[in-house]
């Protein structure tokens, strides 16, 4: 196994981050035009499997899309984005066996020659998470690079803050914004303390903002270092739901994969407890995959703001009656997840901030009478 110094030298992609500031308005129009609106076309497909072996389940989940994935990848670089919201809590993070099954799948379709695994944990150095979760031997076995997104070139997104609604610049890794990369979200099935459920989209959107090199959360945080991920939260329930929605025009997976072998319920994304769901699901329409994910968790999809916003914008299929599930029947694997204790506050997005102002009166003001 590589030691940490050798690992950094041999595997992590470094480089000076170069911030770019394109015309976000024009870019947004272009991104919207590029998104295929599935709600007016054929049904979306989601693969659903069950089993007792993580790697085998991951491999079988992706098999129904072998031809489509191989064609879409072409000569693109494949970016596998695990979920390491914490560097030390395994239940909150993508399992190395799951990643091995996904790598084995790409090997089976002859697309393993240009694959990287790329992540930026929320709480500290990426190398610590790769080491703790035993990703280094997996990367060595399949001869793929482990990348620290905090050391990649950056672009800027502007997201809102509920406090003043002024756009805030957020540094995000260009690796996850570059449409010349084939981005795969390898997410865990978890509840969330702000947006009820965190699945394939959120793994990409909140994983993309970078941290300063050396940043760690808590009391040991070096002076002057910052982490841009909290900016996505928008200082409130309305802010985070809107930011996830608008970011999806720029940051979204080409292939969505959710590991529900054992999910997290309650106070996710790090403080919850395990649910023995024993499922994996995947598809090319990330919104359809996330929709089936919340169904399997027994969560009312109407309560999840950002997913409904994305559905209204035509980013994917959200109507469960228009999603064809390949493999297992969804109804046979629904396990209601305990919701976070903050659930009532999380529904604030469903009500307006204030009542709309009364329209101005159309009756002209009365002129004062002249004294007779």
List where the protein language model places each region.
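N-terminal and secondary-structure boundary signal
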Residues: 1-372
């Amino acid at each position: 196994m590589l030691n940490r110094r050798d690992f950094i030298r041999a595997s992590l992609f470094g480089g000076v981050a170069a911030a770019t500031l394109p015309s976000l308005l024009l870019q947004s129009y272009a991104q919207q035009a590029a998104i295929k609106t599935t709600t007016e076309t054929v049904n979306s497909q989601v693969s659903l499997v069950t089993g007792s072996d993580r790697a085998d389940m991951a491999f079988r989940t992706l098999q129904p899309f072998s031809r489509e994935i191989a064609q879409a990848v072409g000569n693109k670089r494949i970016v596998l984005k695990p979920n390491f919201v914490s560097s030390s809590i395994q239940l909150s993070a993508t399992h190395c066996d799951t990643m091995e099954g996904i790598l084995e799948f790409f090997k089976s379709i002859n697309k393993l020659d240009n694959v990287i695994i790329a992540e930026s944990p929320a709480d500290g150095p990426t190398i610590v998470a790769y080491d703790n979760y035993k990703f280094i031997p997996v990367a060595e076995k399949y001869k793929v690079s482990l990348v620290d997104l905090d050391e990649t070139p950056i672009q800027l997104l502007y997201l809102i803050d509920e406090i003043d609604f002024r756009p805030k610049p957020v540094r995000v890794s260009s690796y996850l914004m570059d449409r010349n990369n084939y981005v795969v979200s390898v997410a865990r099935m978890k509840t969330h303390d702000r947006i009820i459920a965190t699945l394939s989209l959120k793994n990409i959107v909140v994983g993309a903002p970078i941290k300063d090199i050396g940043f760690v959360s808590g009391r040991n945080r070096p002076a002057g270092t910052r982490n841009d991920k909290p900016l996505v939260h928008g200082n409130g329930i309305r802010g985070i739901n809107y930011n996830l929605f608008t970011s999806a025009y720029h940051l979204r997976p080409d292939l969505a994969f959710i590991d529900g072998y054992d999910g997290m319920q309650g106070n996710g994304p790090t403080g919850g407890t395990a649910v023995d769901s024993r499922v994996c699901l995947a598809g090319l329409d990330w919104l359809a995959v996330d929709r089936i994910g919340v169904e399997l968790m027994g969560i009312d999809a109407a309560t999840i703001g950002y997913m409904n916003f994305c559905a209204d914008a035509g980013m994917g299929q959200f109507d469960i009656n228009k999603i064809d599930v390949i493999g297992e029947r969804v109804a046979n694997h629904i396990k209601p997840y305990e919701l976070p204790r903050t659930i009532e506050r999380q529904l604030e997005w469903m009500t307006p901030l204030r009542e709309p102002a009364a329209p101005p009166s159309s009756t002209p003001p009365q002129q004062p009478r002249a004294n007779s």
